[in-house]
């Protein structure tokens, strides 16, 4: 995933987040139960946080190419699609099959954050000042 693609993914994910949040608040909340709306809300929260993380990685990749940040963004994007997407599908369809996809997305999130940590640790320090 290039930083251009990461920015495009973040823009699309952010758009979907806002659109689904508004649709959920104004339409779905009138037709869905509390459990389903909870699934939607959880999906939206995780999508928002991870979209911002992907955006941050894209900006970091503009300054310095890092294989660790590259793979971090891949796993965070995959986690967003699988975790949040499966919660949306579960809420809208009630097919329990989606409940098995959600943890795969969660593991993808964890891998993405771990890779980001490794990438951050491996960054070279620029002129450390001891003033």
Curated annotation (Swiss-Prot):
Q: Which subcellular locations apply to this protein?
A: Cell inner membrane
GO cellular component, alphabetical, reads: plasma membrane
When the coding gene is removed by deletion, what phenotypic consequences does the entry describe?
A: Mutants show a slight decrease in the internalization level of some proline-rich antimicrobial peptides of eukaryotic origin.
Keyword Chloroplast recorded: no
Query: In which broad location class does this protein mainly occur, judging by the first location in its UniProt entry?
Result: membrane
Question: Topology versus the membrane, per the UniProt entry?
Answer: Multi-pass membrane protein
Q: For side Cytoplasmic, which residue ranges?
A: 26-64, 119-131
Could you list this entry's UniProt keywords, alphabetically sorted: Cell inner membrane, Cell membrane, Membrane, Transmembrane, Transmembrane helix
Q: Which residues cross the membrane?
A: 5-25, 65-85, 98-118
- The record places the following residue ranges in the Periplasmic compartment, namely 1-4, 86-97
State the protein's purpose. May be a peptide transporter or a protein that facilitates peptide internalization.
Q: Which family does it belong to?
A: Belongs to the UPF0382 family.
Output this protein's name. Answer: UPF0382 inner membrane protein YgdD
Q: Which organism is it from?
A: Escherichia coli (strain K12)
């Amino acid at each position: 995933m290039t930083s251009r693609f990461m920015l495009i993914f973040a823009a699309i994910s952010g758009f979907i987040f806002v659109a689904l949040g508004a649709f959920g608040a104004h339409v779905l909340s009138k037709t869905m139960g509390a459990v389903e709306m909870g699934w939607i809300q959880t999906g939206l929260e995780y999508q928002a946080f991870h979209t911002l993380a992907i955006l941050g990685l894209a900006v970091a990749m503009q300054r310095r190419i890092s294989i660790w940040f590259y793979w971090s963004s891949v796993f965070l994007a995959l986690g967003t699609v699988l975790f949040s997407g499966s919660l949306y599908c579960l809420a809208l369809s009630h097919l329990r099959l989606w409940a098995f996809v959600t943890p795969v997305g969660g593991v993808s999130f964890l891998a993405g954050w771990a890779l980001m940590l490794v990438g951050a640790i491996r960054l070279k320090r620029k002129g450390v000042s001891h003033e």
